[in-house]
């Protein structure tokens, strides 16, 4: 897809971003890092901290409860998803991989699903005690004013939230699991079934992502994010075999995912992008590599100016100009904030709101600029 989709050189759907990482401010050179003249992210080389920082875009390590995708949803959900009227509400952030800090906002949450669709309350179908309890919860939300006067406020609030969650789950599931749902002239389920997804557990997440995007009209959503998690890349040993196998799976899954979007007429409406906590050392530890800093990322989709490598490719010389030590730890020249900012501009976040979503963006780029910060998207 870097050189063309399905053999078509006019459909270059993939570009690569070189030398990207978490930064608070630009690091002009190796000496600036070593002498401490520039601030650097907290707890570099720590999986937990760097995963959090990629998802929150707050590398200072402050206690932050929201992610940059969630903060974007806080700003644009109501303005973008105008078909959600009255009491109807469906979150715009979906996760097929459990809870993610990335999608949590101050007012907007995430809708967690599985490969089979919405999470269901165990026993919430059929003639069960849990189903009866569910019916009581729903009835509690419409109790008479006299009855409500004597109810505990926490109980009523919990009942209302639970009832709304159940209703949203049922609404989502009826569309997600509909085998006859069409998008244009294409049957959504058939397109997903026929796509060449690899025989691997990650394919269930990609299939669910396709379907969630394809039913956006039924969910009254014009903007969505879908979070997928493909872990297991910490190859301190058996690097060559494990890394190669996982890259092959990812390659096949991305291709099948993009093929579905092309067939369903959604290719120009979706950008797929990767985010990983850090790269690896240049020097082997014997059978693998250790934690480093900067890495490379993938962007894919119709809006992507494909067939490019954006960013500054680093020197791969041990102890060279870009190696800060410990066996080839490369420092990033392109900030995660610049990467995210270009995506958010396309997504609809206004220049005046960008610093709310990405607090450090002003250290790298003027959000009011007429040009994108990196240039991996089509003008």
Regions found by a protein language model. Name each.
Residues 13-15, 271, 296:
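Proline-centered loop/turn at the N-terminus of a beta-strand
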Residues 276-308:
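Histidine-centered active-site microenvironments of extracellular/periplasmic hydrolases
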Residues 254, 260-286:
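Metal-dependent active-site segment of extracytoplasmic phospho-/sulfohydrolases and closely related
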Residues 1-251, 259-260, 308-379:
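Feature for exported/extracytoplasmic and membrane-associated proteins, marking the mature portion
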Residues 220, 265-268, 289-293, 302, ...:
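A structural signal for short secondary-structure junctions
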Residues 228-231, 273-275, 300:
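Generic beta-strand/beta-sheet core signal
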Residues 223-225, 267-269, 275, 292-295, ...:
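Active-site lining segments that contact anionic ligands and/or coordinate catalytic metals
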